[in-house]
């Protein structure tokens, strides 16, 4: 079946979403056009409003509708702690823990094969943020992937010798998890990152 130009454009636009392939995009497009036009229009309006109204916080670079995000605008937060994350979703995840320090949001992780070097992900801006701040500890909360580990290692080397405490988030056995269900790599990290019981 050959789709009209407008339907093809809608399908291709839906394919930019993560995890949405050709067939899923076709189903979504046809469902919106056949069964839920008002929902489709509502989606289009919300998408337009978000694309026009959401930018980046000038201080931490997370997504924000204001010049400063709520975390950066809050004077009660701990100015001595800086948590470095890969993206805005990571800020949301860390916020759920009750963390009360400041953030810096990279634009992903180092990935030379994808052309993502230090400048592309914002390392110079991170250096400026640290230089201009009063931080005593930098928490490297990049993802526990090969690229996330490489990014954390690169940042740690860059910041070494600046009088900062550099820490890495722990990773390993999930709370409530059973050892027999944990993969070998995760268990190895958990054993390497063990801590004494006081």
From Swiss-Prot:
Keywords: DNA damage, DNA recombination, DNA repair, Metal-binding, Zinc, Zinc-finger. GO terms for molecular function: DNA binding; zinc ion binding. Residues 80-174 form the Toprim domain. The lineage of its organism: Bacteria, Pseudomonadati, Pseudomonadota, Gammaproteobacteria, Pseudomonadales. CDD domains: TOPRIM_recR. Gene3D superfamilies: 3.40.1360.10, 6.10.250.240, RecR Domain 1. It comes from Pseudomonas aeruginosa (strain UCBPP-PA14). A zinc finger (C4-type) spans 57-72. May play a role in DNA repair. It seems to be involved in an RecBC-independent recombinational process of DNA repair. It may act with RecF and RecO. Belongs to the RecR family. The keyword Signal does not apply. Coiled coil: none annotated. One of its GO terms (biological process) is DNA repair. This is Recombination protein RecR.
